[in-house]
Amino acid sequence: MPLPKIGNLAPAFSLQNQQGDKVSLKDFKGKKNVVIYFYPKASTPGCTVQACGIRDSSAAFKMLNTVVLGISPDPIKRLQNFIDKQALNFDLLSDEDHSIADKYGAWGPKKFMGKEYDGILRSTFIVGKDGKLKAIMDKVKTKSHHDDVIDWIKVNL
């Protein structure tokens, strides 16, 4: 499957959020910019830092007419627990079979403690109101992720 390219339409998806409601990329076309960020696992240290940075920057994202969607292979119940525990104010989507991560090139080989396995490659995709992919960030730093994304949107959208 070809990886998404900047300037092309972002790969479509429809996934369940933490409450079991379907959220589709097309829901935002013509209305809002969309930040899609793939993260490995809810309630782990790096993912918590990243999510809380986004939570704390919600006013900036709102001012930029941008919605943030986090996607992981976690089941819905784990997503809801993560939202409750961290008071997150944006949707997390469940991609248990990693089919959407595959479409975005966000699933692949990783190494941890000397072992190689397949998993989520922490990455972010910025989609404009026109539904086209505007940016791909694949070298994500969890502590500054929210600021990096906001700065990019301010300059480019």
Language-model features: locations:
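Chalcogenol-based redox active-site neighborhoods
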Residues: 1-157
